[in-house]
């Protein structure tokens, strides 16, 4: 008589995690292990990462490789630049202290969609998001507007960017000044690794949400807006396992930080 597989309950729990959100099928062994620890399913002893990987392999839960996008902003050599205040130190001890911002582009059926976001270095959360069919400075201004509307305590924070002309524009600088936000820029317009934090986040979004899942050139820019907004504001911020946060989604890490201070997030 066949004995039941000792990892059947674990495999079922993994399948449940995989099916909870469309993008969870990109979880590798580390994030799957962290998701199991966070959810702590009843009656299941969580094994080692290595065993988690073996069971994932056995039941066919494998994630796809990532492709990395290239930076698209172009420097305005004549414009006034701001100092590099972060100097590649992207770790923050508390929320709304250090942030990074960038733009990426996605080809659509009716043109290109440009996506701008502000990420918090503390927990990788998206504080502000804006999307337009052009790369004008108002795109970055609207990103700041949305971030400040959602997080008024952003006043006094550092927001770091590359030296693209959108970020050296008077429109963007005036928005920073209006909200009391401090500007920081890459030390050299040619050093893309200074903004690697944002590039990494764009790569994750494109890999998990778009690549091998949708043909973006068959979707309109409006359809893409809905997908991307839902991915970042709902999934990324609240449910996506983030290994850099010790396996916690950004808002859970933030909530625990404020709880440790006796404050509400």
Where are these regions (language model features)?
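Basic, flexible linker segments flanking DNA-binding modules
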Residues: 1-94, 192, 249-259
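RNase H-like two-metal-ion nuclease catalytic core shared by retroviral integrases
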Residues: 5, 72-75, 161-163, 169-173, ...
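Mobile genetic element proteins and their domesticated derivatives, centered on retroelements
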Residues: 14, 32, 52, 56, ...
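Residue-level detector of anion-binding/catalytic polar loops
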Residues: 62, 181-182
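An active-site-proximal beta-strand-loop segment
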Residues: 88-127, 133-135
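Active-site beta-loop-alpha junctions of metal-dependent nucleic acid enzymes
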Residues: 107, 111, 129-152, 168
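C-terminal domain-tail junction helix/linker
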Residues: 177-179, 203-265
């Amino acid at each position: 008589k066949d004995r039941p597989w000792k990892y059947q309950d674990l495999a079922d729990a993994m399948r449940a995690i995989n099916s909870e959100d469309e993008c969870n099928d990109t979880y590798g062994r580390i994030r799957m292990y962290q998701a199991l620890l966070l959810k702590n399913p009843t009656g299941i002893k969580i094994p080692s990462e290595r065993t988690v990987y073996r069971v994932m392999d056995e039941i066919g839960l494998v994630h796809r490789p990532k492709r990395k996008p290239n930076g698209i902003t172009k420097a305005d050599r004549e414009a006034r630049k701001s100092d590099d205040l972060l100097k590649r130190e992207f770790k923050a001890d508390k929320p709304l202290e250090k942030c990074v911002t960038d733009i990426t582009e996605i080809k659509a059926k009716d043109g290109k969609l440009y996506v701008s976001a502000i990420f918090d270095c503390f927990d990788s959360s998206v504080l502000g998001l804006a999307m337009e069919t052009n790369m004008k400075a108002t795109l970055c201004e609207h990103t700041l507007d949305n971030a400040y509307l959602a997080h008024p305590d952003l006043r006094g924070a550092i927001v770091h960017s590359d030296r693209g002309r959108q970020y050296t524009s008077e429109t963007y600088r005036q928005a920073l000044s209006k909200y009391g936000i401090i500007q920081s820029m890459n030390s050299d317009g040619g050093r893309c690794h200074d903004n690697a934090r944002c590039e990494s986040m764009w790569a994750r979004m494109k890999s998990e949400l778009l690549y091998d899942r949708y043909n973006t050139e068959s979707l309109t820019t409006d359809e893409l807006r809905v997908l991307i907004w839902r991915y970042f504001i709902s999934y990324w911020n609240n449910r996506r396992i983030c290994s850099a946060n010790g396996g916690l989604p950004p808002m859970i890490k933030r909530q625990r930080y404020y709880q440790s201070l006796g404050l509400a997030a």
